[in-house]
């Protein structure tokens, strides 16, 4: 089965390519070179590395749809974990020369701060929600300067009647009240040291 409209019918179908990609992720193969070394002899002539990479990018929407369907077939959970991580595009000293996605402000990378590493970086921020077993149910990419707390607006539209565990970056009494009053989402966040009633 093929999702993409291609002039020449590929030897490896889109479903096979997605299956190959997901299998490589499951096997913790994180480079294409390692993947193509492990491919069986009958699969090697069906796809070239450059074509594989291009088709894989074009099939992202279908992979994401599959991931969401899998996440929801696992079923609604009582507990979820929300977190974010930096995605550095280039070193901060080279950010003025970087031309990656700078045509539109909405997609342009920018300067952000990563508290756990205590440093600034240039790029994006990946926000993700997963269940306790580690299966991702949702993720989003934002500019690096976007505060973690703003991702909770997305959570409000997708989840209800659950507990979400987050780090101190998601600490906001207003957001906690809003999530609970509208969707019965309990946001559990550790207290900061300078907070009232803090216990070590």
Region spans (language model):
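Short alpha-helical elements
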Residues: 1-200
């Amino acid at each position: 089965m093929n999702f993409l409209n291609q002039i020449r019918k590929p030897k490896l179908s889109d479903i096979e390519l997605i299956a190959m990609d997901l299998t490589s992720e499951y096997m913790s193969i994180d480079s294409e070179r390692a993947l193509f070394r492990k491919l069986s002899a009958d699969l090697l002539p069906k796809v070239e590395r450059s074509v594989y990479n291009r088709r894989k990018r074009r099939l992202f929407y279908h992979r994401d749809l599959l991931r969401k369907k899998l996440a929801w077939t696992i079923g609604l959970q009582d507990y979820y974990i929300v977190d974010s991580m930096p995605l550095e595009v280039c070193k901060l000293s080279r950010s003025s020369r970087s031309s990656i996605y700078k045509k539109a402000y909405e997609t342009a990378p920018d300067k952000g701060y990563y508290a756990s590493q205590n440093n600034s970086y240039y790029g994006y921020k990946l926000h993700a929600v997963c269940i306790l077993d580690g299966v991702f149910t949702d993720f989003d990419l934002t500019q690096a300067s976007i505060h973690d707390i703003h991702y909770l607006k997305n959570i409000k539209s997708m989840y209800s009647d659950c507990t979400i565990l987050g780090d101190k970056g998601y600490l906001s009494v207003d957001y906690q009240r809003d999530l609970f009053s509208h969707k019965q989402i309990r946001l559990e966040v550790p207290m900061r040291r300078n907070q009232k009633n803090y216990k070590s």
